[in-house]
Swiss-Prot record:
Localization annotation: Cytoplasm
Origin species: Lactobacillus acidophilus (strain ATCC 700396 / NCK56 / N2 / NCFM)
Keyword entries, A-Z: Cytoplasm
Principal location class: cytoplasm
Protein's name in the database: UPF0291 protein LBA1279
Gene Ontology cellular-component terms listed: cytoplasm
Superkingdom as given in the UniProt entry: Bacteria
Length: 86
């Protein structure tokens, strides 16, 4: 994910994950902090997967001759979102 495109909430989650990582490395985490770390990690992965899926679904693939070779699954997703008219 592009750091410039990261929302304030995503940045907050990432910063807190990093804080907890460094604390874990230096002094260890309390059980509550370990649980928080796990939940933040789940949230981070869900956000990452959603952004990645959106990027892939919006992608148009061309071969070296300029012919579109986008997968049918991606084309269907694009049609469903109104991004494609064919």
């Amino acid at each position: 994910m592009n750091k410039d495109a990261m929302s304030k909430e995503e940045k907050k989650v990432t910063d807190r994950i990093n804080e907890l990582y460094h604390k874990k490395e230096n002094e260890g985490l309390t059980p509550e902090e370990e649980e928080e770390r796990k939940e933040l990690h789940k949230k981070f992965l869900a956000n990452f997967r959603a952004a990645f899926k959106q990027d892939v679904e919006n992608m148009v693939i061309l071969d070296k001759n300029g012919k579109e070779v986008t997968s049918e699954k991606a084309k269907q997703a694009q049609r469903k979102k109104g991004l494609r008219k064919d």
